[in-house]
Amino acid sequence: VMADDMCDGIGGSTASHNTAMAKLREKRAHWAPVDKRQLCLGLANYGFYYKGLKPGEKADGPLSRYGSYITYREFLPRVETGGWTEEYDPEAEVSYYFSPDREEFVTIENPVSMRRKIEWITANGFRGAFWWEFHHDYVAPTAEQPAVRHHLNDVVTAHLKEPAADAPNTAKDE
């Protein structure tokens, strides 16, 4: 079950979150007939870039006229050196990122939202997770960092390697 594209993306008419956690919780009822231990949830290493629209705004034509797909690797420099700012949407449980002039925005996962999703997946007994596209957050090895890294995928790997906690898990829906 893909956690991404639960919005209009660039194929619809309203600019909204790509991977809203709230949408996963909402859509869960549709999967009820299938044993959740047989379901893997898809996580996205890409998002959507929009220009000339505000989040939730309906476009006067196809969203593809206002935006495009953007990989995490393409997105990251905007935040690191481009002055883009994050605004968390507590209702959707994910963030938007805005350009300095607020004429552009991106909806994309970040390490915090990715961590919340994998915690929810494991707490609720799903089979696991998979990515679309795995390489979109790839960090090539360097002399200083000789191992391949992934900005988002490594968050999931780290969580899965942690010993099970005895404390109650607040990520669980049931």
Go through the PLM ranges and name each one:
Residues 41, 121, 129:
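Conserved, mostly hydrophobic/aromatic
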Residues 22, 115-119, 123, 150, ...:
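Solvent-exposed, polar/charged alpha-helical surfaces in well-ordered, non-transmembrane soluble domains
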Residues 7, 107-109, 137-140:
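Acidic-and-aromatic substrate-binding clefts and catalytic sites of carbohydrate-active enzymes
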Residues 1-78:
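Substrate-binding surface in catalytic domains of secreted glycosidases
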Residues 15-23, 106-113, 148:
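Soluble or luminal CAZymes and related metallo-dependent hydrolases
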Residues 135-174:
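Aromatic-rich peripheral "rim/lid" segments of glycoside hydrolase catalytic domains that contact
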Residues 65-126:
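Hydrophobic, secondary-structure "cap" segments at the distal end of domains
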